[in-house]
Amino acid sequence: VGYSEDSFTPSEFELTEYLKDGENKLAAQVFKWTASSWCEDQDFYRFSGIYRDVYLFTVPDVHVYDLRIRAIPDETLKKAELEIVTSTWGKGKMKLTLSGKGEILLQEERSLNGEDTCTWEIQDPLLWSAEEPNLYDLELEISDESGKLQEIIPEKVGFRRFEMKDGIMTLNGKRIVFKGVNRHEFSSVTGRHVSREELLKDIVTMKQNNINTCHYPDASPIYRLCDEYGIYMIAENNLESHGTWDIAEFTGDHTDIVPHNKPEWLGMMLDRVNSMYQRDKNHPAILIWSCGNESFGGKDI
């Protein structure tokens, strides 16, 4: 059916044409070493196998397969633009509701025609930050052209303005001081498989100890928890190749560094960055996008 080598972002496979009536067998084979092993040299305990969720799902005839949310206040912080971009299979209708603090801020219906962009102006939005992680509830109710309900998509929206001013990083007009940690996804009991309860414990512990930043290509639930609890994130591409870097530093020969300037590695780099961005692009907690960690440099990065 398919093959994938990025071990930190989801791999999605279309099964429809392979299914038959009655019982079907679904098999997955995990390889310990592949070409991607050169790019996944992060410092952690190494285990083989599948350690994140595996699930089957179906989609309706009218389906939003991609959703992009931009919620950015202007410089006054008194009003913000909410932009919703949808990519849809089939034509239909969308009823959008934005609510928060028990109040409906926005409710509107729009038609869906494949690729659609909708924008609204929001007055006096409650801003998102580590100190006050205000989130709004966004709900998209998708129907076909006859009005029959197809799917409901819930999301969280955080309004925040992150920018550089005179060489200083600011959020909502105020200087940010990052107090971060290189957090690894690991359990002393279950290894690389970490339950939501353990993820929540990590986040609460970080907040209680004045840690406001972390980086890593984590499992999806951690990003939602960082949105909710107010943890700034550096979303990091699944790239670390310091093993080849160490060899080069020892020998003085940089020709074996990966990915460096090698065109044969560029496709993998772009695929990994795109997978990270597409999965996590709507999280207000993500302030910085990282091309990777400890990978020397070069044209590919």
Model regions and ranges:
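Substrate-binding/catalytic cleft of secreted carbohydrate-active enzymes
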Residues: M206, N212-I301
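Secreted/periplasmic carbohydrate-active enzymes, especially glycoside hydrolases
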Residues: V1-M233, R272, L287-I288
